[in-house]
Amino acid sequence: MQDTRATESDVPEHRYNAALAGRIERRWQQRWLERGTFHAPNPTGPLAGPTATLPADKLFVQDMFPYPSGAGLHVGHPLGYIATDVFARYHRMRGRNVLHALGYDAFGLPAEQYAVQTGAHPRDTTESNIATMQRQLDRLGLGHDRRRSFATTDPEYYRWTQWIFLQIYNAWYDLELNRARPISELEEQFASGARPAPDGKDWASMSQAERAAVIDSYRLVYQTDSMVNWCPGLGTVLSNEEVTAEGRSERGNFPVFRKRLWQWMMRITAYADRLVDDLDLLDWPENVKAMQRNWIGRSRGAQVRFDSPAGQIEVFTTRPDTLFGATYVVLAPEHDLVDALAAAQWPADTDPRWTGGAATPAEAVAQYRKSIAAKSDLERQENKEKTGVFLGVHAVNPVNGARVPIFIADYVLSGYGTGAIMAVPGHDQRDWEFATAFGLPIVEVISGGDITAAAHTGEGELVNSDYLNGLSVEEAKATVIGRLEADGHGTGTIQYKLRDWLFARQRYWGEPFPIVYDEDGAPHALPESMLPVRLPELDDFAPVTFDPDDADSEPSPPLAKATDWVHVELDLGDGPKKYRRDTNVMPNWAGSSWYQLRYADPTNADAFCAKENEQYWLGPRTAEHGPDDPGGVDLYVGGVEHAVLHLLYARFWQKVLFDLGYVSSSEPYRRLFNQGYIQAFAYTDPRGAYVPAAEVVERDGAFFWTDATGTEIEVSQEYGKIGKSLKNAISPDEVCDQFGADTFRFYEMSMGPLDTSRPWSTKDVVGAHRFLQRVWRLVVDEETGASRVTEDAPTDETLRFLHRTIAGVDEDFAALRDNTAGAKLIELTNHLTKSYPSGTPRAAVEPLVLMLAPLAPHVAEELWERLGHSESLAHGPFPVADPAWLVEETVEYPIQVNGKVRSRIQVPADADNAAIEAAALADEKIAALLAGATPRKLIVVPGRLVNIVA
């Protein structure tokens, strides 16, 4: 049989294939770089444009920071980067001044652990990883302004991270003005007497240390003895988001324990109301707004005081109407009053279920605290089994004088509310489960449920509640709060789930704190002239780790090893003195909490961002976005996994800078878009170990893999994430080698809506490649390389098709619907290929090439040049649809006969009812159905249908 496979010599010399695509892509990437094609001029500073006039129509597009991983990119990573590039290129072609840049979020635990494992310094591994990722991204032809790139690990960058920290440290929140103010203004208030000193003291007679302690208690950054997540196996404190629901570290899966440590905190709670309320000003997905609202957890209720042997216990409740049903009180095991409340002995007749098997309440408390030390807050809240111990004492219910037992239990958290609850088992399911387990009374105070089966959490009238009986829930809330306030037993109040931000890590690879301590241990902020505080070079930068189960171990930060760096002599304005540097570092969230501002002015050595540049790129645009526009980046794209923490912290920092007058925008991101994920199949052998997905073959509905011995093994298929550990990662380099970067870009954008997840299929990439080949052939003769474009006028049919495509693609690009834009371009290409076999009219193919440019910029630039244009198409013009060609010439009418569609007709768009009726009756199918009979009714619904009643 004859071998019909094509040889290399059979391929036309000028065919668009991977080799030609690679040459085109390298050439145009070099030209863009040399010409500064994507440079966005600033109003002022080193990046200002060559002319005094700056386009008023600007666009700031930003991707969420990539983290430079040692593994490089897989095909899922560039999805959002390509989408923002398409959006930026489209708007740039429409004449807007577009800022689009990309930096690297390079501090943090992953880089440090990778360095510890490899023995290389994290700075070296980070720089190497950035270089790898930059090379991969460059290959995709992303139109970034490279002058604006940076890494959070650059001293020139973290100098300003430290500077912003100091601005927050040197600020306090004025509740009357509802904004942050410089701490110097607070000091002036105390000095002048405008604000009374605490406890009626005379400010002038207070010692410097006493005054400093008062001022420090107001700062937006402060130090406190707080409950933290201590991970001995990693040797560091972890934030809540770094702890799994099982109470283990997300990285390394080590046990995590709750313990008290002296830590830096940021007073984000001062901004809780503004962080909630200002969500209404943002163009963000509703699910992200809901997640932030839930995280902040604003709730209205009452602060109620229960008398106890150790003083008053304050509880916060959103249901003060149920106070008459409170039959016991529960404190968080870490509550400050627990040790004082624990009785010396168990009272007579104490239920054995209440003691935890301990000889005394104090022993029970100690045992219980130890048993829950490794539980995360999430695990404690979700724990199905209710546990706790009695403290051996009772509190007094303030509304009826009833004695109620006091317990500690892990389902009450010290970090929420007051760390104490009044338990109403009749109307709270967790309380009901606890009361059932411990044999505690369950009282109905809201009618309408069966409290013997479960707590009644619905509406109803108040019962068994004295003066509240017969009232609705809302009426009862107002009434009981009024009575509590009158009797001095409580107040109506608002509470939040949001806790202050734990802002210290016991690691090496992070931003050092610009704080030193004097010989008395008092903290001092460094002056701006001493920034940046650079990380010292350490050969041994690994944190001191401990036995993973050693809950009693204490942190020993790596920076403490740099003794020459820690112990310094500085002149802070009162002569040279000895100081000790802070040996903690900032969390990995710090650098990403303000990077949008640095993109606007990345080379400024005198400020984090000049006011003119911030105003231009991020300032409010009320004419465009309405009177309440908070400003911010015009489009921010990234994964929904950062919905709460990163975005909440960035909003907090932006608001502080806004209050202090450093920025004009009160929000960092005006519009947020969460892209979906690219997923892929992974395969596991019978042991559950992953095998290389690329080596798996499908046969008769089953999947097989051949191991190193040549044995074929049946494997199981699963669908989900792409990753190195799953052995299903595909590098974009592989796809670019095989098809070219433009094909890769077009395929990723055509896979489906940007905000949904989609499966990767390498075999489907060829479809995108064949489309680009068809576009190429419209312009270039594959055999000779000559132009196939004619100067002939397109037909009316083509013009109508073309301008409808322009209108549709224009709308799609603006709405981030790149998949449907691509589909329309494919349809237009197919039409031109079929309609003009001997050569395509220039008037039709040039708009096609321009519309293709955002999706496949390299081949579009090449074709544009071959069409005779010397200037890059990167700045347009983007085609504009002619309204005359958007009008429908004909309209299709379905014809119903006795309620069923029997035929369809095409009539001129301007046809009147009489003409439509005549056309309907003349239709062959309708004429046959009527068989000469006259219809009893014939109704024309203009533009929609013809209805015949026979």
Swiss-Prot record:
EC number: 6.1.1.4
Keywords: Aminoacyl-tRNA synthetase, ATP-binding, Cytoplasm, Ligase, Nucleotide-binding, Protein biosynthesis
InterPro entries found in the cross-reference section: aa-tRNA-synth_I_CS, Leu-tRNA-ligase, Leu_tRNA-synth_edit, M/V/L/I-tRNA-synth_anticd-bd, Methionyl/Leucyl_tRNA_Synth, Rossmann-like_a/b/a_fold, tRNAsynth_Ia_anticodon-bd, Val/Leu/Ile-tRNA-synth_edit
Organism: Nocardia farcinica (strain IFM 10152)
Family listed: Belongs to the class-I aminoacyl-tRNA synthetase family.
Localization: Cytoplasm
A GO MF label: aminoacyl-tRNA deacylase activity
Cysteine pairs bridged by disulfides in the record: none
Entry binding sites for ATP: K724
Domain of life: Bacteria
Motif 'HIGH' region location, chain numbering: 66-77
Designated name of the protein: Leucine--tRNA ligase
Coiled coil: none
GO cellular component: cytosol
Motif 'KMSKS' region boundaries: 721-725
HAMAP family: Leu_tRNA_synth_B
Record field: catalytic activity: tRNA(Leu) + L-leucine + ATP = L-leucyl-tRNA(Leu) + AMP + diphosphate
